[in-house]
């Protein structure tokens, strides 16, 4: 049995898609376990760029099974569109498996997400407005509609009708907007269900069988630890658990089945949406990193907020996710910056904090304590090993590993898979 979980150690957008794609080459099964189409990842395959939001990045390899796990919330309309997008470009999706227990995002979830964000005004969370939160709310309230329900015409009709009564009351009485009619949703979404029916099964069985047979299984997290609903910067978080522990619930495999956890980080920090960000840059260096690193959201197109690397954040991620291996991305983006900074702790009212605080009020008063390191000017985009890095670049990478307490296993010096280098195998 060899299982690897890939998690983001920051606020998402760390380059997990690329690392998952890279690790997929040696995996036999690739599974997603949480989130929905609020996450976007860009994969370069055979020289072409593909943007995926729902389907695991291993889909490009016909001999590998790709799983959408039970912990995900699935927008059937978006999924059918993504399947068509791949088919039009000649990519087969016969290797896809969708959990019959995954929950379904429906039009009223999208509408409620949008309206609630508007209602909050200055206190908005900064959601992607993809209906993720409202769908997870229905799941917790035990009124959600699952994929297995979507495939059964009678069950879907009954549950949808019941939910619409409640949602329409909410839309009309609280938000003052028109509700939805059953006939405007039912046939369209039932057809989406029929379109994906051939992929639907009990994916927990698929995954556990693969693990029991000793096959290599890769679990692909979306977002990042700092967006985890329990461990992140609550309430500026997603509605699921991107931490490695989310695999056991969202994929239906026991905790004893997880062997390695790869924490993916950028050599700096980014964040999309609202919420605290202690090392955020509001100067020319921040603008430079954003432009060189092309820091714009895959899903939203929004410019990402940019800051220095924060070892307090990544240490927190290591602890709550049990991270065993570090994958450090986008080192090349920092080339040419004279002096680099790494946050080693926070200063709060004269105290030094080495652990990430739960209180946003405390966090708002925290000032980062920086360690300064000399930068480098050499082009590192063709580097294939740590030994080939300029001395200052290597020192920067090794210092991050020391400060976070995570051994370096992978480092990346560009967006292409050929620019991803292995220091030690995560499948060992």
Curated annotation (Swiss-Prot):
HAMAP family: Adenylosucc_synth (MF_00011). The lineage of its organism: Bacteria, Bacillati, Bacillota, Bacilli, Bacillales. The keyword Metal-binding applies. It catalyses: IMP + L-aspartate + GTP = N(6)-(1,2-dicarboxyethyl)-AMP + GDP + phosphate + 2 H(+). Plays an important role in the de novo pathway of purine nucleotide biosynthesis. Catalyzes the first committed step in the biosynthesis of AMP from IMP. The gene is purA. GO terms for biological process: 'de novo' AMP biosynthetic process; IMP metabolic process. InterPro entries: Adenylosuccin_syn_GTP-bd, Adenylosuccin_syn_Lys_AS, Adenylosuccinate_synth_dom1, Adenylosuccinate_synth_dom2, Adenylosuccinate_synth_dom3, Adenylosuccinate_synthetase, P-loop_NTPase. GO terms for cellular component: cytoplasm. Binds 1 Mg(2+) ion per subunit. It is found in: Cytoplasm. Mg(2+) binds at residues 13, 40. Pathway: Purine metabolism; AMP biosynthesis via de novo pathway; AMP from IMP: step 1/2. This is Adenylosuccinate synthetase.
């Amino acid at each position: 049995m060899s299982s690897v979980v890939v998690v983001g150690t920051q606020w998402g957008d760390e380059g997990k898609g690329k690392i998952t794609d890279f690790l997929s080459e040696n995996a036999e099964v690739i599974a997603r376990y949480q989130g929905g189409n609020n996450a976007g990842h860009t994969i370069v395959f055979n020289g072409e760029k593909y943007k995926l939001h729902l389907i695991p990045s291993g889909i490009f390899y016909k001999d590998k099974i790709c799983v959408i796990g039970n912990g995900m919330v699935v927008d059937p309309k978006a999924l059918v569109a993504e399947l068509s997008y791949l088919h039009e470009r000649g990519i087969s999706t016969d290797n896809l498996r969708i959990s019959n227990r995954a929950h379904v995002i429906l039009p009223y979830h999208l509408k409620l997400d949008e309206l609630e964000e508007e209602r909050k005004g200055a206190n908005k969370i900064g959601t992607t407005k993809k209906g993720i939160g409202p769908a997870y709310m229905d799941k917790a309230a035990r009124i959600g509609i699952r994929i297995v329900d979507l495939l059964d015409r009678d069950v879907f009709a009954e549950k949808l009708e019941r939910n619409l009564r409640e949602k329409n009351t909410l839309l009309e009485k609280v938000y003052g907007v028109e509700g939805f009619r059953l006939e405007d949703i039912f046939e369209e979404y039932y057809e989406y269900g029929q379109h994906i029916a051939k992929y639907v099964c009990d994916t927990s069985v698929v995954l556990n069988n693969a693990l029991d047979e000793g096959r290599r299984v890769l679990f692909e997290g979306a977002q990042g630890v700092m967006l985890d609903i329990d461990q992140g910067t609550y309430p500026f978080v997603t509605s699921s658990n991107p931490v490695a522990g989310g695999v056991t619930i969202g994929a239906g495999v026991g905790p004893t089945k997880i062997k390695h956890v790869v924490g993916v980080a950028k050599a700096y920090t980014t964040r999309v949406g609202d919420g605290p960000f202690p090392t955020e840059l509001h100067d020319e260096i921040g603008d430079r990193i954003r432009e060189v690193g092309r820091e714009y959201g895959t899903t939203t197109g929004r410019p990402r907020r940019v800051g220095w690397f924060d070892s307090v954040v990544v240490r927190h991620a290591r602890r709550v996710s049990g991270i065993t291996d570090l994958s450090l991305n986008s080192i090349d983006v920092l080339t040419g910056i004279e002096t680099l900074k790494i946050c080693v702790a926070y200063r709060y009212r004269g105290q030094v904090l080495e652990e990430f605080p739960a209180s946003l009020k405390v966090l708002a008063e925290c000032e980062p304590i920086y360690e300064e390191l000399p930068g480098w000017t050499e082009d590192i985009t063709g580097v294939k090993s740590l030994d080939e890095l300029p001395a200052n670049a290597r020192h920067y990478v090794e210092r991050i590993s020391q400060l976070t307490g995570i051994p370096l296993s992978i480092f990346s010096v560009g967006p292409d898979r050929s620019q991803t280098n292995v220091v030690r195998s995560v499948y060992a």
